[in-house]
Design a protein with these regions (language model features):
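Short, compositionally stereotyped local motifs that mark structural "simplifiers"
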Residues: 1-47
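Amphipathic alpha-helical interaction segments
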Residues: 18, 30-32, 38-39, 60, ...
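Residues that form or immediately flank small-molecule/cofactor binding pockets and catalytic motifs
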Residues: 25, 100, 112
Length: 169
């Protein structure tokens, strides 16, 4: 028997442990370790582990309450593409900040640069770097690829978007 050591990547950042509110809940089949898994500091490694939130038919729209006003200059959302499992990277990710949780200001829109037909399992961090600003709330919108692309076995059927961690620095 050839046993391999277990590895897991943890990250500490300003949103670890913060509450997450979704406009559309993740799929019941892909809830990771619960609704706040997006801010638990645990990074996903593959499509078959419990660290990914899965969405299809709806964009991933998540707002995070940092608890207090914090100075931030970087936000990142980790996403997965696994072609054979109908999981595709979002077409773009929008990052917004707010002091009151009601009025949000866009700080960046990051476009996907990975081809939709990439067969290899790909983990991509959509990262926004911007001038330091004070914020208590962070909102992220990952725009889901609406359907599996032409030539894919699931062509025209709903595609999945998977995300593992929303990092705030």
């Amino acid at each position: 028997m050839n046993l391999q050591p277990v590895e897991q990547r943890f990250v500490m950042h300003k949103a670890v442990g913060a509450n997450v509110q979704y406009a559309f809940a993740p799929s019941r089949s892909y809830m990771a370790d619960g609704m706040n898994s997006l801010t638990n500091g645990v990074r996903g490694k593959s499509a078959v582990n419990k660290f990914w939130h899965g969405f299809n038919k709806n964009n991933l729209v998540a707002a995070v309450d940092l608890g207090t006003e914090k100075n931030i200059s970087r936000i990142s959302l980790g996403c997965l593409q696994h072609y054979r499992d109908w999981i595709f990277l979002p077409t773009a990710v929008k990052f917004e900040v707010s002091l009151d949780g009601k009025t949000f200001t866009e700080v960046a829109m990051v476009q996907n640069d990975v081809p939709v037909n990439t067969l290899a399992l790909t983990i991509k961090d959509f990262t926004a770097k911007f001038a330091a600003t004070n914020a208590r709330y962070v909102r992220v919108t990952a725009f889901t690829l609406e359907a599996c692309p032409k030539g894919h076995p699931g062509e025209g059927k709903p595609a999945w978007t998977f995300a593992d961690e929303l990092e705030v620095e």
